[in-house]
Amino acid sequence: ARRGSPLAVGYGHEENYLGSDSYALKSMTNKITYLDDGDICVLSNNKVEFYNSKNIKINKEVLTLSDDKHTTDKGDHKDFMSKEINEQHVTAQTCIKEYVDQLRQDINLYHFPIEPKDITKIILIGCGTAYHSCVTAKYWFEELTNIPVEIDIASEFRYRKLKFDNKNLYVFVSQSGETADTYAALDLCKKNNVKTCAIVNVVESSIARTSDFVLPIHAGPEIGVASTKAFIGQMLVLYLLVLKMSEVRKEIS
């Protein structure tokens, strides 16, 4: 059963698996189902059944994981840290390729959940490295979009006396997309019907699936504890978001 922490089911041939996320299961299967909070899973080697918190049987979507050119193998590197440092430029190139239309010379954010002209405040929320990327992005947003910005450590966000406003944009930054405090802050925002955006590395994660809008950082698996390429990806995606919002608001041309 899932309560708080993430949980996923992987499907195999005459065997099924439980794991925290797609990275934990990807070496065994590319077919997975994510449980929502309160879901119950009855698992055997050839059968998987799901129930909600009221013990009613439910159907869950089976996702097919895409092939990822990034692997959890060290390759020729002595450790994951050096490997991931050397992959930083790949993350930057992938982000630019994904979000920047070179022919039109435009930044494509697809279906953004709120008109940038209508945003009165941006709230950036994260923990650890993600929080530090938010601290830097605050200066960019205020300088280039002329929108006031607040930053919150996710673990503190829920304990403030908050006034939610549907003209505010709440941006949640997380490498894994499963950071417990960040997810709890997002859940509070969803209960108050405000617009949310996730900047994550794992597009199938709880934070990504719960948010109104997702901007993946395309860093691939990051095994090293000290964030390297994921931090670069977060910073770059935040900067592209700043540039696009500035353009739409006619703060820059």
Question: What are these model-derived regions, one by one?
Answer:
Residues 1-116, 130, 139, 143-145, ...:
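N-terminal segments that mediate ammonia production and transfer
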